């Protein structure tokens, strides 16, 4: 994965970009497996960025599974649309996208993979995003995201874990993926 668009957007975007470098193969494998992408009929990726996870999702998803990428950065949306012309990307914030209308057409969402920088968001935005997407998860569906190790101890990290736990039936964490830069772990929340 080319780092140039990723780094450029990190420095010039007026909205938070989730990482300075793309996720490692180990973190991507952990996230995609935890989300159950290989058996999902409908997959939503929040904040696909430059497409680091998108390629792994594309390789793992069943033939015919619906995919939607919701990205707030218009430059990255254009890059993604050019790289993955068969996938559907929208230029929108995750708090503003109409998931109800999307699900009316495509059915409930089986897997949500989020690359959003949750610890960069205040409590209000965290809750608005979660309240906009989580009600549209299928029963037994998974919401999967990751956090850099140590960031979960920050105030916004603690608030995010609490908000997720209040809205989901079950929340678990993976072991730390030390090979990622920086090291990270995965939240796996089940509806």
Feature roles, as predicted:
Residues 80-81:
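Conserved SAM-binding loop
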Residues 73, 95:
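Conserved SAM/SAH-binding beta-strand->alpha-helix loop
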Residues 39-49:
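Conserved class I S-adenosyl-L-methionine
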Residues 3-38:
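Class I SAM-dependent methyltransferase Rossmann-like catalytic core
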Residues 51-55:
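Glycine-rich SAM-binding Motif I of class I
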Residues 137-147:
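Conserved beta-strand signature within the Rossmann-like core of class I S-adenosyl-L-methionine
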Residues 127-139:
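A short glycine-rich, Lys/Arg-flanked "PGG" loop and its adjoining helix->strand segment in the class I
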Residues 155-191:
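Class I S-adenosyl-L-methionine
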């Amino acid at each position: 994965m080319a780092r140039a668009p990723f780094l450029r957007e990190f420095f010039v975007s007026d909205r938070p970009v989730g990482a300075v470098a793309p996720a490692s193969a180990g973190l991507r494998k952990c996230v995609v497996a935890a989300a159950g992408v290989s058996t999902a009929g409908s997959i939503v990726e929040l904040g696909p960025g430059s497409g680091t996870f998108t390629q792994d999702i594309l390789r793992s998803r069943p033939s015919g599974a619906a995919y939607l990428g919701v990205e707030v950065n218009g430059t990255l949306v254009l890059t993604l649309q050019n790289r993955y012309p068969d996938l559907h990307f929208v230029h929108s914030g995750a708090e503003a996208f109409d998931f109800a209308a999307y699900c009316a057409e495509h059915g409930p969402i089986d897997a949500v993979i989020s690359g959003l920088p949750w610890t960069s968001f205040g409590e209000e935005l965290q809750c608005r995003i979660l309240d906009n997407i989580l009600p549209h998860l299928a029963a037994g569906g998974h919401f999967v995201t990751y956090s850099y190790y140590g960031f979960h101890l920050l105030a916004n990290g603690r608030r995010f874990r609490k908000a997720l736990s209040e809205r989901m039936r079950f929340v678990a964490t993976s072991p730390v993926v030390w090979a990622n830069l920086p090291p990270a772990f995965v939240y796996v929340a089940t509806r």
